């Protein structure tokens, strides 16, 4: 089972279409989130929102690297 899981993560990590789709999905999700949050009344914490987004992105990439899905 462990070998099968390792083969699956290697095939996903080296897959061009999976990389493209995940990039498009994350880009669209961030854009929609930014538009929604920035348009809220009395919202003035732009740098906090950017920090949180950067932190979540970095932590997600680190987790994916540990699992073996992302290679960098």
UniProtKB/Swiss-Prot annotation:
A cellular-component GO term for this protein: membrane
Protein origin, superkingdom: Eukaryota
Signal peptide as annotated in the record: none
Organism: Saccharomyces cerevisiae (strain ATCC 204508 / S288c) (Baker's yeast)
Compartments reported by the entry: Membrane
Organism placement in taxonomy: Eukaryota, Fungi, Dikarya, Ascomycota, Saccharomycotina
Cytoplasmic topological segments: 1-12, 70-72
Parts of the chain that traverse the membrane: 13-32, 47-69
Protein name from the UniProt record: Uncharacterized protein YER039C-A
Keywords of the record: Membrane, Transmembrane, Transmembrane helix
Family (UniProt): Belongs to the TPT transporter family. SLC35D subfamily.
Misc remark: Present with 98 molecules/cell in log phase SD medium.
Regions of this protein lying in the Lumenal compartment: 33-46
Membrane-related topology note: Multi-pass membrane protein
UniProt keyword Cytoplasm, yes or no: no
